[in-house]
Amino acid sequence: MALSQGLFTFKDVAIEFSQEEWECLDPAQRALYRDVMLENYRNLLSLDEDNIPPEDDISVGFTSKGLSPKENNKEELYHLVILERKESHGINNFDLKEVWENMPKFDSLWDYDVKNYKGMPLTCNKNLTHRKDQQHNKSSIHFSLKQSVSIRDSAHQYFIHDKPFIRNLLKLKNNIRYAGNKYVKCFENKIGLSLQAQLAELQRFQTGEKMYECNPVEKSINSSSVSPLPPCVKNICNKYRKILKYPLLHTQYGRTHIREKSYKCNDCGKAFSKSSNLTNHQRIHSGQRPYKCNECGKAFNQCSNLTRHQRVHTGEKPYQCNICGKVCSQNSNLASHQRMHTGEKPYKCNECGKAFIQRSHLWGHERIHTGEKPYKCNECDKAFAERSSLTQHKRIHTGEKPYICNECGKAFKQCSHLTRHQNIHPGEKPHKCNVCGRAFIQSSSLVEHQRIHTGEKPYKCNKCDKAFIKRSHLWGHQRTHTGEKPYKCTECGKAFTERSNLTQHKKIHTGEKPYKCTECGKAFTQFANLTRHQKIHIEKKHCKHNIHGNALFQSSNLGDHQKSYNREKHIKYNETKIKYSSCT
């Protein structure tokens, strides 16, 4: 049905009910009537039309319909309708500035509205001739608008009110000249949608273009007077299978996959699709860390990093593995942990094909191929491929030993050293070697130990091709090529290539002998010396040596006997040699 185009008065959009009709309306229908009336009034008010009655006249009209005296008061009526609209539609007022200032409440109210909005009987005929390419001035904005609300059972259409604020975007757009472009931009950025795009879609709704199919419960008699509003359908993002509640957001969300990275870092040239991501990135260059922990004073460049750090103080570990029950403080840690159960290694090296559980492990591995060492020590200028290696190295300068044994109180600079030490103490060791029966506290220690039996040596020197069971052994060996001796004794100044050699050397100055034999009480400075000593006790006390049929019951007698036997053998050899030379 074509509608005439031109200016109109408030009477053109006024909705009239007889007293009998009004009394038949339930409270929800009366509320809808008040809502539509006031909306029409403010539509006209935003256009600065001259033939608009004062708002008091609208209140009087409500009184004639039998409303309570309280509702007849202009201020009460205003707050009743506006607050009702705010609670149900997420719009604080039709003024764009006020909408922007109340935007923090917008999302939650929007979700609440969609969840609780019921189907409302409505027939509406509304035509929009305003085009987005027109200038925003009074002379270029014309409407041919006629609205009617029919609450009759014989002619109504139920619809799902999928975008509560879409009808108000027209008023927001008209208020640009009052609010200024600044608020428009803020509004668009805040909700992630374009007002122009919304108005274009609204116009297609109002002109009858069928973007969405109607889902009528009871078809209206006057079908031409029903605007095709969007049904409540699920929109699914094809890339990540994400379900979007709002049809309009499906198109908008899809743009995030192909969005231009228009925010570029001036320092390194890296580009981002969001300005907030660029801001966070620039703090890497500036060193700015605005988020500070109240407990220890440690600062971070991102709020999310501070949140994760605070769990160290609170001990909170909200993420639990459903297989072994282990709890983690971060969701990413739980995801990495669960790959230990599944065996999944999704991060693969393009150079050698080696796969890793965590992306950070892959990054560290790739630097072996590139030779990149971005982490540099401020004290000695030594560089490392991984940040964890730099952290461990710095403890050489600071003397920090954060890993403490709960059994004996001994402290260590590295967690791996503590783990190796804990194997000395008796206790539960769930990881047992199937070959020799030796047990370990951690599975990683068992894996390293099993290489002794299998002969596997995965860590190979690039200089001489010598291979090692442990990475630490390779590092120590590589220093023989470079001549580096980073571990220096503070007492005498002697330097060593390996930390273990320095530790053993220090016992000369301190006189410490921590390794004690449980059989005889003899103490040693080195664990290897204790092991060599214990072989004396391990030998069977009643072993028999069958060299000459002599039975020897003590290891000391066995040693003396072996020496005498070797001496006799040497004498016989010399005698034979003399006889042979005399014959010739």
From Swiss-Prot:
UniProt cross-references to Pfam families, sorted A to Z: KRAB (PF01352), zf-C2H2 (PF00096)
Molecular function terms, GO-annotated: DNA-binding transcription factor activity, RNA polymerase II-specific; RNA polymerase II cis-regulatory region sequence-specific DNA binding; zinc ion binding
Domain KRAB span(s) in chain numbering: 8-90
CDD domains (alphabetical): KRAB_A-box (cd07765)
GO cellular component, one term: nucleus
UniProt keyword list: DNA-binding, Metal-binding, Nucleus, Repeat, Transcription, Transcription regulation, Zinc, Zinc-finger
Localisation per UniProt entry: Nucleus
Record's protein name: Zinc finger protein 677
Name of the gene: ZNF677
